[in-house]
């Protein structure tokens, strides 16, 4: 009679809840477990690094998510940038969203000293040199003046490393804070800093409609 072993022990309970981390054998042969595909949205706090683990003991985005799944961040936000970050165990979705050819829209809210002029806005739309043989592009969606400062909503599609910070450096504009508020068809909404939620199937499907 064939037996089932879970983590080296015979299992006779048909209702036993197997997790992706369990080692399962049936009749002496290893069983490959098929994981459910999940996507989480995290509102990343400041001074948290976008990585699965850190050898220097710094806080990572994984410290804020309690999940049995092996998750990978989709793209990254630098330490100082807060806001919307997606994490998933779905390799196909991860590849789709991070592939440069898909030009996924990412919306940010920046607080800056002064304001972006009409001429600078036009330059950003065409693309400006940001160093290392790269050009940064951004679409200014909205700009509001706040007592000598401005709150600017920008949309990026290229995803170059620290692109917005490099753009403002080239424009000689001081960047006070930066928060990602949208990714593809998703919005951060009222998700609090340091909190996360699981996306529903409708939201996951919307990520393919870019």
What does each of the following model-derived ranges do?
Residues 1-210:
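Basic, flexible Lys/Arg- and Gly-enriched helix-loop patches that mediate nucleic-acid binding at interfaces
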């Amino acid at each position: 009679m064939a037996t089932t072993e879970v983590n080296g022990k015979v299992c006779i309970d048909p209702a036993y809840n197997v997790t992706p981390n369990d080692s399962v054998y049936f009749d002496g042969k290893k069983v490959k477990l098929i994981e459910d595909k999940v996507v989480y949205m995290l509102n990343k706090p400041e001074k948290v690094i976008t990585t699965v683990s850190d050898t220097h003991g710094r806080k990572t985005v994984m410290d804020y998510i309690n999940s049995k799944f092996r998750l990978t961040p989709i793209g990254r936000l630098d330490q100082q940038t807060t806001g919307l970050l997606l994490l998933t165990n779905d390799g196909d979705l991860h590849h789709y969203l991070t592939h440069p050819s898909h030009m996924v829209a990412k919306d940010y809210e920046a607080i800056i000293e002064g304001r972006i002029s009409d001429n600078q806005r036009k330059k950003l739309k065409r693309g400006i040199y940001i160093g290392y043989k790269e050009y940064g592009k951004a679409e200014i969606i909205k700009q509001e003046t706040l007592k000598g400062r401005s709150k600017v909503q920008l949309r990026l599609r290229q995803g170059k490393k620290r692109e917005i910070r490099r753009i403002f450096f080239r424009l000689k504009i001081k960047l006070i804070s930066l928060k990602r508020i949208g990714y593809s068809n998703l919005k951060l909404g009222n998700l609090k800093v340091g909190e996360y939620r699981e996306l529903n199937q409708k939201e996951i499907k919307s990520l393919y409609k870019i």
